Amino acid sequence: MKAFYGILIIFILISMLDLSQQVFINAKCRGSPQCLPKCKEAIGKAAGKCMNGKCKCYP
C-alpha cells in the first residue's frame, strides 16, 4: 500500500509540471478554425485551437 501512495505522489508532482510546448498568442477567436491561419503565421505550423476566446498554438 505504501508503494501505491508513493507512486500516486510522484504522479501528482509530475502532472503539475508544464511539459507541453503550447503557445498562447494574443489573437481573439470564436472557433478553432479561426486559429489555424493565425498559428501558421505566428509559429509556422497550423496546429492550434480556440480556448476562452484566445488562440492556443502547438508547435
UniProtKB/Swiss-Prot annotation:
- Gene3D superfamilies on file: Knottin, scorpion toxin-like
Which cysteines in this chain are paired by disulphide bridges? Answer: 29-50, 35-55, 39-57
Q: Which residues, if any, are the signal sequence?
A: 1-22
Where does tissue-level expression of this protein occur? Expressed by the venom gland.
Enumerate the GO terms in the molecular function aspect. ion channel inhibitor activity; potassium channel regulator activity; toxin activity
Q: Which keywords belong to this entry? A: Disulfide bond, Ion channel impairing toxin, Neurotoxin, Potassium channel impairing toxin, Secreted, Signal, Toxin, Voltage-gated potassium channel impairing toxin
Task: Give site residues, Basic residue of the functional dyad.
Answer: 49
Q: Where in the cell is it found?
A: Secreted
Q: Which InterPro entries match?
A: Scorpion_toxin-like_sf (IPR036574), Scorpion_toxinS_K_inh (IPR001947)
Give the positions of the site Aromatic residue of the functional dyad: 58
Q: Which sequence ranges form a coiled-coil region, renumbered to this chain?
A: none
Pfam families, sorted: Toxin_2 (PF00451)
Give the record's GO CC terms: extracellular region
Q: What is known of its domains?
A: Has the structural arrangement of an alpha-helix connected to a beta-sheet by disulfide bonds (CSalpha/beta).
The function of this protein is: Potently blocks Kv1.1/KCNA1 (85%), Kv1.2/KCNA2 (91%), Kv1.3/KCNA3 (89%), Kv1.6/KCNA6 (94%), and Shaker (97%).
Give the family per the record.
Answer: Belongs to the short scorpion toxin superfamily. Potassium channel inhibitor family. Alpha-KTx 04 subfamily.
Name listed for the protein in its UniProt record: Putative potassium channel toxin Ts23
